[in-house]
Amino acid sequence: MFEMPKVTRREFCESVAATAMLVTAIPVGATEAKSKPFIKWAGGKGQLLEQLSALLPKDFAERKDVVYVEPFVGGGAMLFHMLGTYPNIKKAIINDLNSDLITTYKVIKERPEELIAILRVMQGEYRSCKNESELKEYYLAKRERYNSREAKDVEVAALFIFINRTCFNGLYRVNSKGKYNVPFGKAKNPLICDEETIMMDSRLLQKVEILNGDFEGVEKCVERGGAFFYFDPPYRPLTQTASFTAYSIAPAMNYCESAA
């Protein structure tokens, strides 16, 4: 059985130094060009950004001091696209019901170097496994640690990203007891520690208020006038036994009308 990697002071300092060098090496404007979600997410709109952008108000780029709001942020494909493309967005407000996803957003915003230090160790240990059996054992050990709910914020974020990169098809699914149960994805050499993306996303998240709760509570945090809402609610479950959060169309429509 594998143990959760313990990052030594030396490893942490080396990671912080390397991360600082990485940030220095990123040219001006690179954030806008390369920013992208730090995880794969079911229903993500990364492949539809061009079509979605065409639906924006024609004068969006000329508007001043825009407040951009996403009540269902998920993987954040549209969020990072908007923040990287439109400097007139002075603030963004994002929300999601998944508390570990939101914890990961907050860690990337506030403590990216610590997150990278842990992910580097995980990536090195994962890639040092000799065969598929060892890879699976390592994955299951991390999944068990994640489900134990004993980890603190930075470790939670690292585990969340790790299982997203190494599970089957990047799925997030829990059983009736709230335990993450997606099987091993058999990836031999995944990019677990995407340092450049984490640091670029951290830059963009500096002007983002990050919320965790029901979407209907987001309106209370938004001042009237000037806010632009992007709604992308989660898909309804195909069966009554599927453990995905469902939203009916009526509450969402009522929310849109009240926020208008």
Model-assigned labels for residue ranges:
Residues 52, 68-82, 94-98, 161-168, ...:
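Conserved proline-anchored active-site loop of SAM-dependent methyltransferases
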Residues 34-51, 55-56:
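Class I SAM-dependent methyltransferase Rossmann-like catalytic core
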Residues 54-62, 222:
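Glycine-rich helix-loop-beta junction characteristic of Rossmann-like nucleotide cofactor-binding loops
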Residues 228, 236-260:
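SAM-dependent methyltransferase catalytic-core segment centered on the flexible catalytic loop
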Residues 84-206:
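Class I S-adenosyl-L-methionine-dependent methyltransferase module
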Residues 2-6, 11-30:
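N-terminal export signals
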Residues 61-66, 88-89:
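Short helix-terminating capping/connector loops at secondary-structure junctions
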Residues 198-224, 229-230:
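A mid-sequence, solvent-exposed acidic-amphipathic segment
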